[in-house]
Amino acid sequence: MACMTRVLFLSSLRLFAGRGMRACIAVLLVLLLAGCVGSPFDASSDSESEATPDELFQTHTDRVATLGMRKNLDALYRLMEKLYRRNPAEWRKSGAPNAQVAGQRIRWAVEQHQPLRELGSRSDIAALAFTLGPDYRGDRVGGFIYALGSMLITAHDGQTTFYMTDMLNAQYIHNAARNMEKASWLLANRKDPHGRPWLLSNEMSVQGQNLSYAIEFGKIVARLDLLTEVLDESGRRMGVSYAQSLLFMNFLPVQ
């Protein structure tokens, strides 16, 4: 941003400079633009990754949806790690030797569309409230994250990667964002019969504040809302383009 600001400043100076000064400024502009082009991006940015053959079959919206899905699932797995650290008794219920192995089981079940034995036939929204209720006896952290992950994938038509032939429903994505907000509230407020949280998460005390769980949920919701807007705009533009083609009755060249 600072680099481009300097470019714009030098460009404006050319309007008022003499011929010799304009030549000097032109040289400076070339050098500065070269520096702008060579400036590295944030290492965490997906724009630095190499293009893959699959991207030839993806529209801009498909790419946004694919990247958003990956980031959202990764955010859920980070939440799972945090929750296991604060609630170690939960991963032990799964029979796994440690939290990492317990987490791998949940991740595999989410991405391979496999059911969790302790949830029976429940998945996505049917499993959400159940995992934070008195009748659930399994790993609450794993069950909760599995429910959220399967809900996300269901809202995206059962897929995690998207291509030109795929049609995402903006309303389902919007609903998934609202479900995430409700899940965040349930996590913070659902308590057992003794008044204790089913799962320890956000904390505000005299020792300090830990709102990292709410922040992670907020990022997921923001990405889902952005995708909803992108899908709505894509559909609107398709309708406008079709109407324009009818209005102007443009014929296509045949030679």
Segments predicted by a language model, with ranges:
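N-terminal secretory signal peptides that target proteins for export/translocation
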Residues: M1-R19
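Structural motif marking the loop-to-transmembrane transition
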Residues: L13, A17-M21, R137, Y213
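Mature extracellular/secreted ectodomains of secretory-pathway proteins
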Residues: K93-T228, D232-L246
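Long, compositionally biased low-complexity regions that are usually intrinsically disordered
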Residues: V37-G38, S245-Q255
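Sec-dependent signal peptide recognition
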Residues: R22-V27
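N-terminal Sec/ER secretory leader and immediately downstream segment
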Residues: V37-R140
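C-terminal motif of bacterial Sec signal peptides marking the signal peptidase cleavage site
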Residues: L32-G35
